[in-house]
Amino acid sequence: MGLEEKLPSGFLLTTVEQAAGWVRKASVFPATFGLACCAIEMMTTGAGRYDLARFGMEVFRGSPRQADLMIVAGRVSQKMAPVLRQVYDQMPNPKWVISMGVCASSGGMFNNYAIVQGVDHIVPVDIYLPGCPPRPEMLIDAILKLHQKIQSSKLGVNAEEAAREAEEAALKALPTIEMKGLLR
């Protein structure tokens, strides 16, 4: 004697946030920010063998104003960091970021002054994807995990507050590793 038996068939009970999340996850438009080896794997993911179109990502967008997902693939130099931030700021809300590869996530093997030790110091990151470089299957798995996160995301004032908190955390983040080794 559950709720399903009391309602006539053809009815669906949900919330506005769940319905909007279901629609949003099926129409994510990625912008590429490929900087190194990981960019090759990201391009492979969009090709015929892996076919990102089945997840609602027909084409990588050339303009950040048409995208709501930024895939940062590869190492980010100190000179490239302001450009990365500018591209992120030009994206419309809601926006998400995948940090693809160990170089984007933590600086990787480039432990020196010229490379940002994790893009989470510049933009808030939603999904971290490990690997050097990660395989296309791993990127697809990260996109599916992002779909789950998008489907459960908040709307309105709650979304603005969550975005503001993530932004502040990204700007206050401490370096992930201490620079040691041959250079110090």
From Swiss-Prot:
Ranges annotated as spanning the membrane: none
Cofactor(s) listed: [4Fe-4S] cluster
UniProtKB keywords: 4Fe-4S, Cell membrane, Iron, Iron-sulfur, Membrane, Metal-binding, NAD, Quinone, Translocase, Transport
UniProt catalytic activity: a quinone + NADH + 5 H(+)(in) = a quinol + NAD(+) + 4 H(+)(out)
Membrane topology field: Peripheral membrane protein
Cellular component annotations (GO), alphabetically ordered: plasma membrane; respiratory chain complex I
Assembly with partners or alone: NDH-1 is composed of 14 different subunits. Subunits NuoB, C, D, E, F, and G constitute the peripheral sector of the complex.
PANTHER family, per the entry: NADH DEHYDROGENASE, NADH DEHYDROGENASE [UBIQUINONE] IRON-SULFUR PROTEIN 7, MITOCHONDRIAL
Record function comment: NDH-1 shuttles electrons from NADH, via FMN and iron-sulfur (Fe-S) centers, to quinones in the respiratory chain. The immediate electron acceptor for the enzyme in this species is believed to be a menaquinone. Couples the redox reaction to proton translocation (for every two electrons transferred, four hydrogen ions are translocated across the cytoplasmic membrane), and thus conserves the redox energy in a proton gradient.
The family this protein is said to belong to: Belongs to the complex I 20 kDa subunit family.
Protein name as annotated: NADH-quinone oxidoreductase subunit B 1
Gene: nuoB1
